[in-house]
Design a protein with these regions (language model features):
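Bacterial N-terminal signal peptides
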Residues: 4-13
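Beta-strand-rich recognition domains
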Residues: 18-158
Length: 172
């Protein structure tokens, strides 16, 4: 799962993602949470958009699986992602920024108006999150994520021997 998320993180910067199959649904970032109860200092002066995000957009019906891409950060609980009232999945519980790739089953999109909802789960735990840069790719998730490959080798400069290591890839 993490490998798929990592590939999705790189995806938004790739030229392949900007193809005709790619539709930006919302380019803005939205702070979601409970008003008056900021979880982090950075949200003290930034009131939340609300406890959920409702986004309406026009699209074509999807005869095959498509992929919903959502940039997210500071997620500590499983926020639900719904399309036209149907649950697609949950945001990844991870505080680091990432792009989540959720499969959109065939027939889930309607021709014309559609509604995407990201809503907090019923929980007493505070969870201020940031979501945005939401896009829809008409290709199945496997195809979308298959566009990106990374080949990294870490070797000793003198001997050329492979070195054990841990890498963190970021999009900044």
């Amino acid at each position: 799962m993490f490998r798929l998320l990592l590939f999705a993180l790189i995806l938004l910067g790739s030229a392949a993602a900007r193809s005709a199959s790619y539709q930006v649904l919302d380019a803005k970032r939205h702070h979601l949470g409970v008003a008056g109860l900021p979880e982090w200092d950075e949200f003290e002066t930034s009131p939340p958009h609300g406890p959920q995000l409702d986004l309406t957009f026009a699209a074509e019906a999807n005869p095959r699986e498509a992929t919903l891409l959502i940039r997210q950060r500071e997620v500590k609980t499983a926020w639900n992602v719904l399309l036209n009232g149907r649950k697609l999945g949950v945001l990844e519980t991870l505080t680091q920024p990432l792009v989540l790739a959720l499969p959109v089953p065939a027939g889930a999109l309607r021709k014309g108006g559609n509604r995407l909802t990201i809503m907090r789960p019923p929980s007493r735990m505070l969870d201020d999150i940031v979501v945005g840069e939401i896009a829809l790719d008409s290709r199945p998730r496997g195809e979308v994520l298959g566009d990106v490959t990374i080949d990294i080798r870490v070797t000793d400069a003198e001997s050329g021997a492979a070195l054990p290591c841990r890498l963190t890839l970021v999009d900044q």
